[in-house]
A protein has these predicted regions:
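N-terminal DNA-binding module of tyrosine recombinases/phage integrases
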Residues: 2-36, 118-129
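Non-catalytic DNA-binding core/recognition domains of DNA-processing enzymes
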Residues: 39-124
Length: 130
């Protein structure tokens, strides 16, 4: 029987993030936003990158790790890892609930991270949970 307070497993160190623009998955996201909406997605919403960075800290993963944990290549095609998608969907909901402010602000934070996943091929339902 495994105890949730098992002291044999060392605690996970906090992820050390590089500037987000250095991650391939972030470039994919920003390129997709630019193609879809135009403008400069890195600057047209100054909260966009800080929100993703905050989520990465919450999940303790860098952006590329998140995409690796939610996708795989099978038979030469990118596929979604269902367990990974479910895990991150729940993490987004949990993180979104910790955001200070209105329901709309919480929804924007969650939907920003969902947008990152969607533009990297991980389809998620949009939501204003809160």
């Amino acid at each position: 029987m495994t105890d949730a307070t098992d002291t044999n497993t060392p605690p996970e160190l906090p992820v050390a993030l590089r500037p987000l623009a250095e991650y391939a998955s972030v470039q994919t996201w920003l390129d997709g936003l630019k193609q879809h909406w135009g403008g400069d997605p890195a600057t047209d919403d100054p909260e966009r990158l800080p929100m993703l960075e905050a989520f990465c800290g919450y999940a303790n993963r860098d952006p590329d790790q998140i995409i690796k944990e939610t996708t795989m290549i099978k038979d030469g095609e990118k596929r979604i890892r269902l367990k990974g998608r479910e895990r991150y969907s729940k993490l987004i909901d949990g993180w979104q609930a910790t955001i200070e402010g209105s329901r709309i602000r919480k929804g924007k934070a969650g939907n920003t991270v969902r947008s990152f996943l969607i533009h990297n091929g991980v389809l998620l339902a949009s939501g204003m949970q809160g």
